[in-house]
A protein has these predicted regions:
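Basic nucleic-acid-binding alpha-helical/helix-turn surface characteristic of O6-alkylguanine DNA
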Residues: 1-96, 144-147
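Short clusters of hydrophobic/aromatic residues that line enzyme substrate/ligand-binding pockets
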Residues: 56-60, 101, 126-129
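LysM (lysin motif) carbohydrate-binding repeats in extracellular/periplasmic proteins that recognize
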Residues: 95-98, 139
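Regulatory, non-catalytic segments
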Residues: 98-108
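Short Lys/Arg-enriched helix C-cap and helix-to-coil transition segments
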Residues: 112-119
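…primarily DNA-binding HTH/wHTH and HhH modules…
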Residues: 122-147
Length: 147
């Protein structure tokens, strides 16, 4: 478990990289391996405000092609900036797939590393977040985004 300001996080990895970040209350099989100390170091630095980009390898094995495309595009959104579900849909070449993009964000296995907290609704409202709206608000404020 990683103690973060938004609650305890369980970090799961494969030989290829981090596979999942789980918020408190989410269940995982017991035999899933924990992530390396480098992963926790980078998260510690992120929450301390000294890291703006993650360098640890990520493993999206098992994610559908469309969702992986959305997540790869989302990973490009820089620290301190936001995008919208509609902008992401356009960026992956499917401007009518706004709801599918929302679903991809909601099921993002790697929140924080792939920053779904930086996605807002088109009206500027926060929208949902798997870790809770309060956590999303905290992360955005921490990154200097006034929402």
């Amino acid at each position: 478990m990683f103690a973060s300001p938004i609650g305890p996080l369980r970090l799961v990895a494969s030989e290829s990289g981090v596979t999942r970040v789980c918020f408190e209350g989410e269940q995982l099989p017991i035999d899933e391996p924990s992530a390396s100390p480098l992963v926790t170091q980078e998260l510690t630095e992120y929450f301390a405000g000294t890291r703006r980009e993650f360098t640890v390898p990520l493993d999206l094995t098992g994610v559908t092609e469309f969702r992986a495309a959305v997540l790869r595009e989302l990973a490009k959104v820089p620290y301190g900036e936001t995008t919208t579900y509609a902008q992401l849909a356009r960026a992956v070449g499917n401007p009518k797939a706004v709801r599918a993009v929302g679903s991809a964000c909601a099921t993002n296995p790697l929140p924080l590393f792939i920053p779904c907290h930086r996605v807002l609704r088109s009206d500027g409202q926060l929208g949902g977040y798997r870790g809770g709206v309060e956590a999303k608000h905290f992360l955005l404020r921490m990154e200097g985004i006034d929402v």
